[in-house]
């Protein structure tokens, strides 16, 4: 319960009983006194009471004395009646009728109402007066105020306790995170697990509020946890299975012919020992006897193949070319640079 809500409730509780008491003490125009015009009534009241024309207002617990004074030589017998129509006898106690006096001892809230005095001789006359009692004992406003104060006290204690618990938890969590950043090695992983136990899972509004407070350090801690998870070694069985699958894919991998040329262009320069060359298909077939055996394959559609060759020095290349010309009567190539194997060609098979 918020403070301004509690104050508003206290204000309402204070004003409602005041309005009820004003309703009780308001004069009623409907209660008109009826009396004989030949008699002038008068009432004598005790201290602490208030007298109006036909309404008497007294506080609860006070004593009141009503006297009916008539301008006649002799009084006849006076009878008093309450608002319920019951005649009040002069037997003492709370209601005391003495001559023309009505004494009420310790007025209660239930005594409010219309009181009538009647005189039967020498002439019949009557007079009515309304008695109003101000309610002072057992006030409901006090009850509501006590209930409101108790509820406010309980709410305040719960809020203060919750704030203290959250503050303590935040201080401990921040201290653990700072220690985590200062540790290194295997101890850091142990600190990480300790912090993970302290950080709650966001499942309600309270834990969401806690997460907002520690959002920055929690995210920073999560990044460290990810790095540590990458450094944790996998089980040997998983590692062997992964290596086996990688070797299997390497064995059955088939290169796409359309992407072969692009990959060769992007490949870095070959070292001086070996390389892969693509032979140009526009270049004519050799005049070797082995080549004459499959002349019909010239009309077939060309395909690209990867040929792995070894690169020799220039002197070795010239000697090899001379020996091959003497033995096989090969025609020398038009481009001398092709003998060194420094360019790429395509061949049709």
Swiss-Prot record:
InterPro entries: Ig-like_dom, Ig-like_dom_sf, Ig-like_fold, Ig_sub, Ig_sub2. It is found in: Cell membrane. Glycans are attached at residues 31, 36, 63, 103. Pfam families: Ig_3. Glycosylated. The chain crosses the membrane at residues 140-160. The keyword Kinase does not apply. Keywords: Cell membrane, Disulfide bond, Glycoprotein, Immunoglobulin domain, Membrane, Signal, Transmembrane, Transmembrane helix. GO terms for cellular component: plasma membrane. Residues 280-349 are annotated as: Disordered. Residues 41-130 form the Ig-like C2-type domain. Residues 311-331 have a biased composition (Polar residues). Residues 22-139 are extracellular. It is a single-pass type I membrane protein. Residues 1-21 form the signal peptide. Residues 161-349 are cytoplasmic. The keyword Cell membrane applies. Disulfide bonds join 68-117. Component of the elastin-associated microfibrils. This is Microfibril-associated glycoprotein 3. It comes from Mus musculus.
């Amino acid at each position: 319960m918020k403070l301004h809500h509690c104050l508003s409730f206290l204000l309402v509780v204070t004003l409602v009983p005041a309005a009820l008491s004003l309703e009780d003490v308001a004069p009623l125009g409907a209660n008109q006194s009826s009396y004989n015009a030949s008699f002038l009534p008068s009432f004598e009241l005790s201290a602490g009471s208030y007298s109006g024309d036909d309404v008497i207002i007294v506080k609860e617990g006070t004593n009141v004395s009503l006297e009916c004074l008539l301008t006649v030589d002799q009084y006849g017998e006076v009878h008093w009646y309450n608002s319920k129509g019951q005649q009040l006898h002069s037997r003492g106690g709370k209601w005391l009728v003495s001559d023309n006096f009505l004494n009420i001892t310790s007025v209660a809230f239930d005594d409010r109402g219309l009181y009538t005095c009647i005189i039967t001789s020498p002439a019949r006359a009557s007079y009515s007066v309304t008695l109003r009692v101000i309610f002072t004992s057992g006030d409901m406003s006090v009850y509501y105020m006590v209930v409101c104060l108790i509820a406010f006290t309980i709410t305040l204690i719960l809020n203060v306790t919750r704030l203290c618990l959250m503050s303590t938890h935040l201080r401990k969590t921040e201290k653990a995170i700072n220690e985590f950043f200062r540790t290194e090695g295997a101890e850091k992983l142990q600190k990480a697990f300790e912090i993970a136990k302290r950080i709650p899972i966001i499942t309600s509004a309270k834990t969401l509020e806690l997460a907002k407070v520690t959002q920055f350090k929690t995210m920073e801690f999560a990044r460290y946890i990810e790095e540590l998870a990458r450094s944790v070694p996998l089980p040997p069985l998983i590692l062997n299975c992964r290596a086996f699958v990688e070797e299997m894919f390497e064995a059955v991998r088939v290169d796409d012919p359309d992407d072969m040329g692009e990959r060769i262009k992007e490949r870095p320069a070959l070292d001086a020992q070996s390389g892969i060359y693509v032979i140009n298909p526009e270049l004519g077939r050799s005049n070797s006897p082995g080549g004459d055996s499959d002349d019909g394959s010239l009309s077939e559609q060309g395909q690209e193949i990867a040929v792995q060759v070894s690169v020799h020095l220039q002197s070795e290349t010239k000697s090899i070319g001379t020996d091959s010309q003497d033995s096989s009567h090969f025609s020398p190539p038009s481009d001398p640079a092709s003998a060194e194997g420094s360019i790429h060609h395509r061949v049709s098979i």
